[in-house]
Amino acid sequence: MNKMNAAVLTEYKKIDWKSVDIPKISENEVLIKVGYACICGSDQHIFLGEFHPRTSLPLIQGHEFAGKIVAIGPKVKNYKVGDRVAVDPIIWCGKCPACRRHHYPACTTLKLVGVDLDGGFSEYMKVPE
């Protein structure tokens, strides 16, 4: 099985239900089978084309979701297959000056799940540990 269903924002104001590849995880990522996903106000703004200049289409939205880990990369230490998780949608590097001061929202390479990266309006989602 290497395909999944996802709600893909193909153009602003248009979402298509598509069969897409299940994300492949890297050594420090986990694969989550999404169990629950919520629609947030920012999802609505992205749908309408009003929200974020970094968003590019096509995009799988959804930054508020939870599920169960079904696969882990070989360097993942804090999670195991079967763990139930809710995802922090902010992905920071942990290495830049802002991150070293624990000011993660100012990370120089900050990415937001469902905004910069595909999100949880899908059957599976990958995120870094």
Regions found by a protein language model. Give the residues of each.
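NAD(P)H dinucleotide-binding glycine-rich loop of Rossmann-like/cofactor-binding domains
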Residues: C93-E129
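Glycine-rich beta-strand-centered segment in the early N-terminal region that forms part
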Residues: P23-A37, E50-P97
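Short N-terminal binding/cap micro-motifs at the start of the first secondary-structure element
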Residues: K13-W17, G41-S42
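Cytochrome P450 core scaffold surrounding the K-helix E-X-X-R motif
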Residues: S42-L48
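Short secondary-structure boundary segments
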Residues: Q44, P89, K111
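Extreme N-terminal starter segment of soluble prokaryotic enzymes
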Residues: N2-N5
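Generic structural detector for well-ordered beta-strands
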Residues: S19-D21, K126
